[in-house]
Amino acid sequence: MNHCILACDVGLKRIGLATLKQEIILPLPPIIRINRNQAAKELDNVLKERNIHILVVGMPSGGEAEHSDTQKRISHFISLLSFEGEICFVNEDYTSFNALQSLSYMKRQNRARAQKDGRIDSLSACEILQRYIQSQKS
């Protein structure tokens, strides 16, 4: 498996990030969005600094009308990147829910803080990366 992989969970306020290092999926600090151009520039910087070859992007399945809007928004955001490597889209359905569930051992206040500071988003990106890796094995 190529070690130069970055996964992202693109949201309106934050972009969760995760990478693969020595076959271990690790969350990275999220990008806090001020606007889409600033966020795209920051993501471009991460991609260059980490010498990423594959960008894995979480994309909701096409079931509902709001998913269609989200798909368009994510596709537009990714089009702002100057990244020239491979871009793969992976179904992100329930990744945020699962990430929140994985923190159920935490007190409510700490879970809320993890949501606000983007740690939840980076845990979602970890699950997106896990789904990508599983899809490559099958």
UniProtKB/Swiss-Prot annotation:
Could be a nuclease involved in processing of the 5'-end of pre-16S rRNA. Its EC number is 3.1.-.-. It is found in: Cytoplasm. InterPro entries: RNaseH-like_sf, YqgF, YqgF/RNaseH-like_dom, YqgF/RNaseH-like_dom_sf. GO terms for biological process: rRNA 5'-end processing. It comes from the Bacteria. SUPFAM superfamilies: Ribonuclease H-like. The keyword Transferase does not apply. One of its GO terms (molecular function) is nuclease activity. One of its GO terms (cellular component) is cytosol. Pfam families: RuvX. Belongs to the YqgF nuclease family. Keywords: Cytoplasm, Hydrolase, Nuclease, Ribosome biogenesis. This is Putative pre-16S rRNA nuclease. Its main location: cytoplasm. It comes from Helicobacter hepaticus (strain ATCC 51449 / 3B1).
